[in-house]
Amino acid sequence: MSKKLTFQEIILTLQQFWNEQGCLLMQAYDTEKGAGTMSPYTFLRAIGPEPWNAAYVEPSRRPADGRYGENPNRLYQHHQFQVVMKPSPSNIQELYLESLERLGINPLEHDIRFVEDNWENPSTGSAGLGWEVWLDGMEITQFTYFQQVGGLATGPVTSEVTYSLERLASYIQEVDSVYDIEWADGVKYGEIFIQPEYEHSKYSFEVSDQDMLLENFTKFEKEAERALEEGLVHPAFDYVLKCSHTFNLLDARGAVSVTERAGYIARIRNLARVVAKTFVAERKKLGFPLLDEATRAELLKEDAE
């Protein structure tokens, strides 16, 4: 590797590469979530017949993974670079390897392995065939072909590539701690994020109000249901995301038992499934506007028969 890219140069390089492949460059969605997959730019757009190619950075919050800024690799919040392509290009794996080359990682000079790791997200009723991508022994990417999202079978096939930006940057910059990553020239990751990491960890494990969180979960759940009754998919999905984050805070606090945990996950999943079905129905009412004319006419004709 000739040049050690900064964290933001890694993002810019990936954005430029996937822009060249026809992806829309979206911005991070403004509601807390545990993974880039839970953004509406993936969760909603992976279902239904319309094509969709997008790439975006997604800050992902996982309260139970917080370590007060003391662990070099475990974080309350990390950053994913998410790529979703529907229909999946036949050469998606080759494109991924080419993206690594853009980052200065020559696949011929490194041990890059696709290790089978089928993916499932029980709280959203989603699953797919997947692989972890290991670079010289370090997992840097999750690669998935969605089979089901929100309880609905996907078609056409959607591929998702999720880069772990902190791990990738640690490898490229040859540092052992994420806090030593150069975000930009002269500015380290820790100078930006170590204090929020400490504070969010303290809040998640010690300070959060369990009764308030339990009450909010129920309120968010009811508001999602109310929005769905009005056919308002996107506001409803925002409240599903709020339910998910609230549950994650409760889980980190140890406020839910094993039995209760399964119940909360089922409640989130049931909402996510209704959101998914309603989204496809609403897109159909609009005539699936992202489809080309011939495909749209054929599909709507089949549905009418």
Curated annotation (Swiss-Prot):
Q: Where is this gene product found?
A: Cytoplasm
> Where is it mostly found?
cytoplasm
A Pfam family in this protein?
Answer: tRNA-synt_2e
**Gene3D superfamilies found in the cross-reference section:** Bira Bifunctional Protein, Domain 2, Class II aaRS and biotin synthetases, domain 2
Swiss-Prot/TrEMBL GO biological process terms: glycyl-tRNA aminoacylation
Q: What is its EC number?
A: 6.1.1.14
Instruction: Offer a single GO CC term for the protein.
Output: cytosol
Quote the InterPro entries the UniProt record gives: aa-tRNA-synth_II/BPL/LPL (IPR045864), Gly-tRNA-synth_heterodimer (IPR006194), Gly-tRNA_ligase_asu (IPR002310)
The UniProt keywords, alphabetically, are: Aminoacyl-tRNA synthetase, ATP-binding, Cytoplasm, Ligase, Nucleotide-binding, Protein biosynthesis
Secretion signal, residue range per the UniProt entry: none
Disulfide pattern: none
EC primary class: ligase
| Reaction catalysed by this enzyme | tRNA(Gly) + glycine + ATP = glycyl-tRNA(Gly) + AMP + diphosphate
| SUPFAM superfamilies with a match to the protein in the record | Class II aaRS and biotin synthetases (SSF55681)
Q: Could you cite one Gene Ontology molecular function of this protein?
A: glycine-tRNA ligase activity
Protein family membership: Belongs to the class-II aminoacyl-tRNA synthetase family.
Assembly description? Tetramer of two alpha and two beta subunits.
NCBIfam families (alphabetical): glyQ, PRK09348.1
- PANTHER family attached to this UniProt entry: GLYCINE--TRNA LIGASE, CHLOROPLASTIC_MITOCHONDRIAL 2, GLYCYL-TRNA SYNTHETASE
Q: What is this protein called?
A: Glycine--tRNA ligase alpha subunit
Give the species this sequence originates from: Streptococcus suis (strain 05ZYH33)
